[in-house]
């Protein structure tokens, strides 16, 4: 399965053409869709041979869903009133389970000239902002079948632009609601920051029925009944600074396929903090391309699985410019019969002198039935680097830490809980909205094994560092 193309019965040239026609897209964007469709037909599901043994899509039935139909006009989404803004947010872009888009901009966002709307509206008014960024597939990895599927068939397109020199201290909130049974929501989000612009983005993904994102529902043979596919395509001009945080809490019957990519010019920086707790299956791929000299990436991603959930967290970082820096950390906690595949690749091109990079992947198993693998990798074509290293481990909670906390008066369960939540806190602390921070902490608490389930777990993996 991993070397074969994705088998999507609903991914047809006719559907891509019809979607483009309904949305009234220009000819060049239809060409983009057809290019993605052609790529999708020949790409392997997993392009990296090192990772092919660790791809499992058995909990997804691609033929059991059909894509949500696009709206003929962006006016179907309308504009929410100012009261719709979450407290402390500069702007809100909300996408419902039927693909309807609502946008609300605060006074500060309007004052700095923030652009946030659908592809349709932007293409009708300021197409010069969009075309140079996405044309020729520049913002979607050419080897990512899941990203190309969204590029070909997206019925929802969101475009966000922060003008050069502008700075937003409060976050732009992008909220997705998904989980409509028998439906797949496919989307593209393009985020552009001009030179020396600064912004915070908080992406929130929740289930349409308000269900808690645990993996307890269903048996191993049952497939997710709803799907969410989405790209996040980030283009950072020279000196731009972006903080991107994400929280995924889809319902237990949803499979999610997230493809995110950032391209960084000279002295630009992006800080990722992504937490995933929901869904039946969650596949996340994050690509960073450090093109410009002095570009910097900081990335932290966590997943907490229970029941029969599967988290597939993959990152690719390519150092191309000189004196670039990346610090990448992925963490997983798994209980029940959940599984975690944490995979990463750092590539240092011959042109990337002075690179400083670290990749860390760590999994904690709370029960003997949970499983995880961590696969950090380096490809170095330039010996003149400041640092290039990786580290990984898979295992149970450190009993030395448990003993220490128990000696300070905590019960065994409380000690284990404190260690796990502290293990995940680096992402929680980065969430820019206090209410969202509290919600994520509550979700993580709720995932904790009840009773005495959280006992010492066996470890199918060891630890290694390079």
Feature locations, PLM:
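Conserved beta-strand/loop scaffold segments within soluble protein domains that form the structured core
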Residues: 22, 104, 116-410, 424, ...
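Short arginine-rich
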Residues: 41-50, 423-433
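Short, low-complexity, intrinsically disordered N-terminal peptides in bacterial proteins
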Residues: 1-11, 456-466
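N-terminal amphipathic, basic helical "cap/leader" segment at the start of enzyme domains
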Residues: 2-148, 329
């Amino acid at each position: 399965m991993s070397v074969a193309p994705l088998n999507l019965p609903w991914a047809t040239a006719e559907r891509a053409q019809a979607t483009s026609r309904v949305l009234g897209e220009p000819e060049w964007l239809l060409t983009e869709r057809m290019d993605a469709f052609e790529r999708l037909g020949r790409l392997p599901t997993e392009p990296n041979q090192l990772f092919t043994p660790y791809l499992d899509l058995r909990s997804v039935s691609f033929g059991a869903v059909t894509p949500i139909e696009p709206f003929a006009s962006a006016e179907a989404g309308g504009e929410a009133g100012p009261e719709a803004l979450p407290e402390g947010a500069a702007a809100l872009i909300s996408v419902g389970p039927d693909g309807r888009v609502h946008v609300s901009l605060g006074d500060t966002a309007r004052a700095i000239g923030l652009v946030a709307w659908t592809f349709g509206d932007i293409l009708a008014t300021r197409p010069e902002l969009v075309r140079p960024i996405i044309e020729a597939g520049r913002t979607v990895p050419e080897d990512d079948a899941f990203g190309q599927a969204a590029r070909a068939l997206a019925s929802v397109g969101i475009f966000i632009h922060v003008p050069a020199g502008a700075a937003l201290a409060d976050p732009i909130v992008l909220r997705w609601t998904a989980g409509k049974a028998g439906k797949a929501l496919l989307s593209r989000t393009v985020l552009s920051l001009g030179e020396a612009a600064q912004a915070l983005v908080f992406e929130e993904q929740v289930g349409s029925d308000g269900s808690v994102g645990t993996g307890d529902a269903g048996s191993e043979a049952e497939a997710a009944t709803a799907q969410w596919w989405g790209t996040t395509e980030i283009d950072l001009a020279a000196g731009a600074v972006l903080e991107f945080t994400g929280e995924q809490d889809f319902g237990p019957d949803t499979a999610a396929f997230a493809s995110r990519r950032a391209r960084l010019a000279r002295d630009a920086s992006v800080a990722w903090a992504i937490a995933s707790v929901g869904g039946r299956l969650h596949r996340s791929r994050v690509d960073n391309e450090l093109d410009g000299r002095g570009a910097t990436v900081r990335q932290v991603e966590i997943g907490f699985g229970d029941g029969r959930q599967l988290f597939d967290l993959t990152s690719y970082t390519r150092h191309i410019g000189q004196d670039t820096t990346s610090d990448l950390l992925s963490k997983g906690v798994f209980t029940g019969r959940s599984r975690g595949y944490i995979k990463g690749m750092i590539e240092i091109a011959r042109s990337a002198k002075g690179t400083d990079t670290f990749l860390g992947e760590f999994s904690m198993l709370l029960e003997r039935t949970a499983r995880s693998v961590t696969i950090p990798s380096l490809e170095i074509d330039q010996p003149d680097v400041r640092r290039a290293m990786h580290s990984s481990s898979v295992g149970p909670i450190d009993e030395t830490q448990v003993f220490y906390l128990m000696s300070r008066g905590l019960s065994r369960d409380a000690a284990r809980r404190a260690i796990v939540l502290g293990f995940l806190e680096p992402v929680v602390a980065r969430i820019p909205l206090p209410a969202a921070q509290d919600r994520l902490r509550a979700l993580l608490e709720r995932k904790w094994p009840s009773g005495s389930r959280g006992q010492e777990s066996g470890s199918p993996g060891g630890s290694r560092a390079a």
